[in-house]
């Protein structure tokens, strides 16, 4: 059983929902990311998504685009991210999912990336621009090295796409609650509950919901119908508002509030 599957099994046994937190690796620098991952886990995150910064983040809104720019300006690269994850693994076992775009992985080499990521302690990979129809080669590499490949479903996904994802899904499925790019929203789409229910009928792995969840109340609302919630832009926004000295405290406070809202 993968670390992600084990986490969801334990959560289900305890009637709890998963809190998945997103930060961009290398923002403001990799030393900060290395310190934040254990802090996120201690504050209540069950899974940590690490954004791999990319120069053309087409699925991301302004907050995460700026975060990627800061990380790239700090010299963040994929090999450096994997080295950082390897160091984190000496003191923290929270599941880590790399989230990003296909191009950096392709440049690194698919087989080499899967081997290097697994050796570093990465548990899963979500590539937002790699649909299941085009993922066979990468998924074969990931499967050989024990990496869960996470796929996206959206409000516009038809039954055919849902079936394709159901056949390939490992770890969990990420349901994008809104059309458009990442970023905080003022409310939760009314269709989330019914759409998630339909997906859960077709898919055996857990379904988590992300994009636009920015407050504890929204997280609680989504958690009522999903297996977990993903909060990203609202956390990354804190990086713009607070100094490096303040950041850890502010992130911990916010994540703890999210955890309390969806149930301890």
From Swiss-Prot:
One of its GO terms (cellular component) is cytosol. Tetramer of two alpha and two beta chains. Belongs to the TrpA family. NCBIfam families: trpA (TIGR00262). The keyword Membrane does not apply. This is Tryptophan synthase alpha chain. One of its GO terms (molecular function) is tryptophan synthase activity. It is an enzyme of class 4 (lyase). The alpha subunit is responsible for the aldol cleavage of indoleglycerol phosphate to indole and glyceraldehyde 3-phosphate. The gene is trpA. The lineage of its organism: Bacteria, Pseudomonadati, Thermodesulfobacteriota, Desulfuromonadia, Geobacterales.
